[in-house]
């Protein structure tokens, strides 16, 4: 299977975290401790199967946060193979662009995936060997309420035919993990999708809609259904408080 070959997971953690700052937090969001562990650990434990399969983890951070010592220590503790760390001087025009910087530093012919730093997924639900050999894209999704997500619409065969940002075209809301056949493919897709300023939505360059350009070119994209109860959102102070008060079963299981 294509997905079983080790590649690079790009962790985009270069946002401002302004909601946490306004709530009184003084450290970067990913360092905030919940149930005895930093949010960084809670987010990355959902990728244990990729870690065990030998994938590298690359990171995009903000230079002013001097995150490298923290990353080095946490990756060593978690058994993660640490790849490049890119320090950005400011925010980019979207996650797609932040991930592009990491794609440029990755093995161009190996699989490439992007994940955020504010979502918990129960360990072992996301597995590289579950990605079929013929796929060009793979997007884990869950049935989440509301329209504040990216959404994937599938046909009767289960193939993705459309992806939209914060437009509820289906019940398949993405969890924020985006897999691509290769880093080179991600870079080429980025250039095509955002050529001449096209593809920018509300001033931002999102990853999910990039799959529409992949599909239009004949690429095959499928989703993975993830149980809603096994996902915990960590993107806002309110979500973190809810996670601490009632962690998903997969999170409770890791606490022993």
Please describe what each predicted stretch is.
Residues 121-197:
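Conserved core of the sugar-phosphate nucleotidyltransferase
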Residues 2-9, 173-256:
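Conserved alpha/beta core of the MobA/IspD/sugar-nucleotide pyrophosphorylase nucleotidyltransferase superfamily
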Residues 65, 119-121:
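A short, conserved beta-strand element in the Rossmann-like catalytic core
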Residues 16, 118-119:
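Active-site metal-binding loops of divalent metal-dependent hydrolases
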Residues 27-29:
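Short alpha-helical oligomerization interface
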Residues 31, 152-154, 223:
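A structural signal for short hydrophobic beta-strand segments in well-ordered beta-sheet cores
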Residues 40, 102, 118, 152, ...:
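Residue-level signal for inorganic ion chemistry
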């Amino acid at each position: 299977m294509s997905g079983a070959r080790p590649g690079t997971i790009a962790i985009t953690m270069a946002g401002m975290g302004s909601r946490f700052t306004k709530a009184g937090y003084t450290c970067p969001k990913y360092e905030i401790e919940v149930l005895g562990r930093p949010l960084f650990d809670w987010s990355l434990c959902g990728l244990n199967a990729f870690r065990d399969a030998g994938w590298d983890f690359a990171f995009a951070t903000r230079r002013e946060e001097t995150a490298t010592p923290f990353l080095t220590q946490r990756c060593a503790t978690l058994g993660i193979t640490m790849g490049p760390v890119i320090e950005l001087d400011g925010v980019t025009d979207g996650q797609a662009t932040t991930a592009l910087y990491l794609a440029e530093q990755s093995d161009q012919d190996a699989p490439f995936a992007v994940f955020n730093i504010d979502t918990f997924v129960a360990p072992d639900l996301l597995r590289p060997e579950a990605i079929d050999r013929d796929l060009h894209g793979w997007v884990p999704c869950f049935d989440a309420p509301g329209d504040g997500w990216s959404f994937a619409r599938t046909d009767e065969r289960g193939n993705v035919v459309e992806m939209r940002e914060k437009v509820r075209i289906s019940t398949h809301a993405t969890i924020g993990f985006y897999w691509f056949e290769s880093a080179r493919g991600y870079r080429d897709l980025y250039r095509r999708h955002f050529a001449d300023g096209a593809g920018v939505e509300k001033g931002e360059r999102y990853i999910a809609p990039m799959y529409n350009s992949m599909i239009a070119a004949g690429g095959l994209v499928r989703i993975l259904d993830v149980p809603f109860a096994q996902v915990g959102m960590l993107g806002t102070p309110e979500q973190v408080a809810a996670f601490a008060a009632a962690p998903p079963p997969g999170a409770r299981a890791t606490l022993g």
